[in-house]
Amino acid sequence: MNSLTTSAFDLPDHLAPKADPALIARDVQHFAAIAESLEQSIAELSDRLDAERKSPGGIGRQAMDRDLEIHRLTARLRALRRFGLDLCLGHMVSADDPEPVYVGRLGLTDSTGRRLLLDWRSPAAEPFFGATHGNPMGLASRRRYRWTRGRISDYWDEVFTSDGFEGHAAALDDQSAFIASLGGNRSPRMRDVLGTIQADQDAIIRAGSRGALVVDGGPGTGKTVVALHRSAYLLYSDPRLGHRRGGVLFVGPHQPYLAYVADVLPSLGEEGVQTCTLRDLVAEGGGAAVETDPEVARLKSSAELVKAIEPAVRFYENPPTKGMTVTTHFSDIWLSPEDWAEAFDAAEPGTPHNEARDQIWEELLTILLDKHDDDEASPDLLRKSLLRNRELLKTFNRAWPLIEAADLVGDLWTVPAYLRKCAPWLSTDEIRLLQRADAQAWTVSDLPLLDAARLRLGDPEAARRKRRHKADLAAEREKMNKVVDALIESDHDGEGLVTMLRGEDIQNSLVEETTAPGTEPDQLAGPFAHIVVDEAQELTDAEWQMLLLRCPSRSFTIVGDRAQARHGFTESWQERLERVGLDRINLASLSINYRTPEEIMAAAEPVIRAALPDANVPTSIRSNDIPVVHGSVSELHSILDTWLAANADGIACVIGDPTFETTSRVRSLTPELSKGLEFDLVVLIDPEKFGEGIEGAVDRYVAMTRATQQLVILTSS
């Protein structure tokens, strides 16, 4: 359990204004009460659990009741020990009651019955997840915490009332800070703009989870934060999305982005959201290189090529066309081609190739046992003899082998005839182009095919684990039968609860719990009830298949900006998504940029319009009178030193200089890795070297619009 003896707050030096007692004194007091209640509850539960374990076991119903109580106490104790003060997600303040209501992963009261934490799943907690500036649901403000190793390392306040900003300035989140900056002198135009922002965001957050919702918006429109709030709200409001129904998967473009997501989306423990990049979905993703040949990348980006995986697997699922004599210790049995075909048909539809082997093998043994007409041999002895028949095993393994996904996909790139058979629509030149010397020199473009192959094949170790598991179960049942025999012998009437242990269902449930296979499930394999995809304009048709395979319900929140697509995006969202396999598509647009100053957007807009004349560039409504600065690369360090000295808070980013090393307050990124992130100061190094055509223009546009305060462009010439 996390420590409860220290202050809940551990704010870094640059967030010193947030440590003002006027902002956090009430929290400190409340967290002290939570800590005291947690320690008391844990001590009481531990004592009760010890007492139950030491109490006489009893017999019959008494024994069962005792076991149930031990199970209940253990579960509650485990839940409380799993977290410390970070049980608390945040608090909300009602417009008509200044007393904060703290929302937690679990409900918690003190010894007097005073509520310390409101369970996040209760109806009373809905405003914490559902309130927006357009529909505050009766809230005056909401505070979210960022927990790091059990202590608060940052927090943000959202203020929903026009007179509630006083005293919150140091802790306001971006949108609340923007609204506060407008002050009381809002023009009619600004009031209209603000109303548009609030109404659009509210509609997106509250839109139902059925089908695909596209949130289209340019830089600074708040689309990512809106999507994150939507995730939290859907998880709260839609019971179909709980983790026992599949849960929510949030897919981001890269790891720096996922770190940002962790700051915004509240962690909801077991009911939470899985976050990942596309690379994380495939074991080979971490080491995969970028495909250097654009034509190879284009061919592999097609969803059509992913379909080649099915015939590639079926190639290894052909029953023998010749019969064979199977020799046993008792007699010879003829196994005909028709018998092989019947066994192969026994695989249940949808069963992965490697996992279907057991079904086919069992059917094959059944056919052979049925054809044996010698009554002298028992089925068990005959079965053991068949299992030792090397020729039978060899023929079966050749007809339906265990296959690794990496071997299957690697063969496509090194055996031209195999690729031609599986993808007959490819031309001879295209087949030749896709061949390579190293079968498993994986690139990012290979990942969708590896993913599809792994799903279609299943785990090659699954059959082995399953056989070991069955052997363990048999041994456990045999041991349990001996125990039951002893219990019945000691039971006076031989009836009641003890004899119930003879029941197969009860034995199965008890044995399954004690001998479950020791494998960690793939948390990203799905299926998921809902998937959120950010920077979705970058996904290829093949990459979309990776996500569709994980979401049978086709329930998506799709966040993106066509103008930021590095490889171009000339069609509409509707056309793109229908082509990859989605239907029931709704589009929501965010057109107002309330974060990026007009001065920066004025410089960035011509850059993207030169390559994409119809780019959807958002309207920037904020000016800070700081012009875009141009200079020489030699000025980089002096510019950063001057900015750091003048700004105690904030983060800067240098984009385009791989030799610059990241520091505590200055990041160093490529244009591609800066996507989706924001910084107070952005310094571009030789942006003209970012590339040519649409890709270069998009990289320059994205890099320029990462700045929320100041943009500096430095060149070598």
Predicted feature descriptions by range:
Residues 336-530, 539-544:
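Conserved helicase NTPase catalytic core signature
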Residues 2-45, 52, 167, 173, ...:
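P-loop NTPase Walker
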Residues 240-241, 246, 255-300, 456-457, ...:
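Conserved helicase motor core of SF1/SF2 NTP-dependent helicases
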Residues 208-211, 217, 239, 243-249, ...:
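Conserved ATP-dependent motor core of P-loop NTPases, especially the RecA-like helicase ATPase domain
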Residues 250-251, 386, 443, 590, ...:
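Active-site-adjacent beta-strand anchor residues
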Residues 197, 453, 536:
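Conserved hydrophobic/aromatic pocket- or pore-lining residues that grip, position, or stack substrates
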Residues 1-194, 199-202:
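Extended, charged low-complexity regulatory segments
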